[in-house]
Structures are given as structure tokens and as C-alpha cells.
């Protein structure tokens, strides 16, 4: 969360997008959809069509790909990215995973979803994305991660990704964050894995996750530092 706040104070976004902020977004509640609509609607001045809070796909592929390999699914492994925004996690998995994946990115900002669908299909001057495995697929849908009933049935995903979504939702109160966690665990396969990426210290995050995911195993791995900031991957796993 501290990293999100620091980046909101920057006059322009890095990693190729370089989008200047209009107004003082740093003082807004990160659980407010209007804030994210405004962010995602800003012009992209760089050549990179995605923007990542914290870090991108390249920094965590060493963690994600072994999980896909270990699953050894007979059909494409179903992956859900909650609060995907315009991140490269979904597109990176789709275009670079040597293992077949069926990736769904959901976000409560229709602006973000429209942008990612345009990127996937190949908008003006863009080439459609190509899968890293011929059996892989990628979709984006408009949905609130705290209520996934319209897009996901119980136990339907083997891997769930949450990069900063808990952090943002928790700004609206911890009950909302627990609602997010509960819904993620509902749609997660009992043998699957939920990964929360955050810069929040384990002393703060682990007690919350352990309280909200009883019956699941919660572990943490340190990531980075990336651009001088240490991050953490919080893994919530069922029986394997």
C-alpha cells in the first residue's frame, strides 16, 4: 500500500506509460472506482500498452510458472486475476507461458476492461496478442472482485492472482477486504493457490489472512527488491 501511495504522488507513471496525473489522486480512496476509471482513461504516452503497480509479469514469472507446471492439468489451467486493471500479469501469462492456461482478468473499472480487450483483439495500429501455447486463451470481464457470481462458479479456478487489490479494497475498510478474500476462496479450487502480491509487511498481513482463510495454508515469500522496494507474495493454498 505504501508503494501505491508513493506512485500516486509521482507526476508521471513509469515503465513506458508516463501518464501524468490530473489532480491530487493521492488523496483519494483507493477503493473508489471513479479514481481508477480516471487513471485508466488517461492518455498513454509511451510504447508499453500495459501499466503495473508494484511490478510486472517478468518479475514474478519465476514464481508463477512452476505452479503451472506442478498442476499438470489435463486441460488448460484456469487462472483468475482479480482487479487486473491494465496490468501485464494476464497478458504475460497468456503470451509467454509454455503451459496451456485459460486466463480471466476481472476489474470493476469498465475503462480498464475496455482497454485490455482492445489490446487483446488488436486495436488501431496494434497486433492482436498471440498465445504462448496454442491451447491458451485470455478474456477480460467487468466485475467486482467481491461478487464474482456472474463470472465464476465455486471451485472453478486453480490459480488466483491479487496484485494490490486487497490493499486498495482495504482502504474502504477491512470488512470489504475480508469479503474479497472470501469470494476469492469460494471460486478457488480446493487444491488451488491464491497469491496476494503486496508491499504490506507480513506482521500486518499474515494475521488478517490467517483469520480470513481458516482451513487453508498461508505462507509468504519475499520478492525483490524492485526499484528499491521489497514486496511479498502471500500464498493461500489448499491441500495438494
UniProtKB/Swiss-Prot annotation:
Keywords: Methyltransferase, Mitochondrion, S-adenosyl-L-methionine, Transferase, Transit peptide
Broadest EC class assigned to this enzyme: transferase
UniProt keyword annotation of Disulfide bond present: no
GO molecular function, one term: lysine N-methyltransferase activity
Stored InterPro entries: Lys/N-term_MeTrsfase_sf (IPR051419), Methyltranfer_dom (IPR025714), SAM-dependent_MTases_sf (IPR029063)
GO biological process, one term: protein methylation
Record's subcellular location: Mitochondrion
Name of the protein in question: Citrate synthase-lysine N-methyltransferase CSKMT, mitochondrial
Gene: CSKMT
Amino acid at each position: 500500500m505504501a508503494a501505491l501511495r508513493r506512485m500516486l504522488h509521482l507526476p508521471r507513471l513509469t515503465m513506458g506509460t508516463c501518464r501524468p496525473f490530473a489532480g491530487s489522486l493521492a488523496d483519494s480512496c483507493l477503493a473508489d472506482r471513479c479514481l481508477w476509471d480516471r487513471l485508466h482513461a488517461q492518455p498513454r504516452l509511451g510504447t508499453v500498452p500495459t501499466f503495473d503497480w508494484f511490478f510486472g509479469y517478468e518479475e514474478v514469472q519465476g514464481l508463477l510458472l512452476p505452479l503451472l507446471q506442478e498442476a499438470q492439468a489435463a486441460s488448460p489451467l484456469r487462472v483468475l486475476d482479480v482487479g487486473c486493471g491494465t496490468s501485464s500479469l494476464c497478458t504475460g501469462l497468456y503470451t509467454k507461458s509454455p503451459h496451456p492456461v485459460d486466463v480471466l482478468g476481472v476489474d470493476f473499472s469498465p475503462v480498464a476492461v475496455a482497454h485490455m480487450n482492445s489490446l487483446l483483439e488488436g486495436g488501431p495500429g496494434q497486433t492482436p496478442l498471440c498465445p504462448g501455447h496454442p491451447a491458451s486463451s485470455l478474456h477480460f470481464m467487468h466485475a467486482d472482485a467481491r461478487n464474482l457470481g456472474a463470472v465464476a462458479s465455486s471451485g472453478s479456478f486453480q490459480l488466483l492472482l491479487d496484485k494490490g487489490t486487497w490493499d486498495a479494497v482495504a482502504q474502504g475498510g477491512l470488512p470489504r477486504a475480508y469479503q474479497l478474500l472470501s469470494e476469492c476462496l469460494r471460486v478457488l479450487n480446493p487444491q488451488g493457490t491464491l497469491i496476494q502480491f503486496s508491499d504490506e509487511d507480513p506482521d500486518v498481513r499474515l494475521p488478517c489472512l490467517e483469520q480470513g482463510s481458516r482451513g487453508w495454508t498461508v505462507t509468504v515469500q519475499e520478492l525483490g527488491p524492485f526499484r528499491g522496494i521489497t514486496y511479498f507474495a502471500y500464498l493461500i493454498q489448499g491441500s495438494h
